[in-house]
Amino acid sequence: MELWLTGTILKPKGLKGELKVQPVTDFPDRFLSRTKYFAGRQPETVVPVNVKSATLSQGFAWLFFEGVDSREKAQEMAGMHLYIEEKECAPRPQNRAWLHELEGMRVKGRDGVEVGVLTAILPMPAHEVYEVRTGNGTVLIPAIDEFIDEISLEGGYIVVPRFDEFL
């Protein structure tokens, strides 16, 4: 079973187990209709969770799960990721990439010279940030058109011509 990341649990809200979730999807409305997720800190350690109720507000999903009925139980889930099965995903729109397809891609700087590997995609309120591992450590690159010139799924690379500005 292949799992796809769809959200990150940020923190509990209130005393009854409600959870604030940062969607990591182009389709946040699907949080309103989905009844099951797989929750875990890594895809290898997930457990199924059933949704009791869901709302969307201010760019976040607010979820109640069966069996999570207190702030303490909700706090244990903070920092976990929510995954769905690949078969539940909508087809990828043309000229778009799923986030998990980008992880592991080579990152090229000016003149096509390889500078590192994309190791993680960090969800942030304004936009995602790419974590790139280089020979000298880790660099964070905002995932916006100003810095990302090209993403080639077929070639397995991302072009960041101004990479030197982040060193």
From Swiss-Prot:
PRC barrel domain sequence ranges: 94-166
Any GO CC annotation of this UniProt entry: cytoplasm
Gene Ontology biological process terms, A to Z: ribosomal small subunit biogenesis; rRNA processing
Highest taxon, organism lineage: Bacteria
GO molecular function annotation: ribosome binding
Localisation per UniProt entry: Cytoplasm
Listed transmembrane segments: none
Gene3D superfamilies tied to this protein: PRC-barrel domain, RimM
Keywords, alphabetical: Chaperone, Cytoplasm, Ribosome biogenesis, rRNA processing
Signal peptide residue numbers: none
A Pfam match: PRC_RimM
Main location: cytoplasm
Family named by the database record: Belongs to the RimM family.
Role: An accessory protein needed during the final step in the assembly of 30S ribosomal subunit, possibly for assembly of the head region. Essential for efficient processing of 16S rRNA. May be needed both before and after RbfA during the maturation of 16S rRNA. It has affinity for free ribosomal 30S subunits but not for 70S ribosomes.
Domain remarks: The PRC barrel domain binds ribosomal protein uS19.
NCBIfam families found in the cross-reference section: 16S_RimM
Quaternary assembly: Binds ribosomal protein uS19.
The protein's name in its UniProt record: Ribosome maturation factor RimM
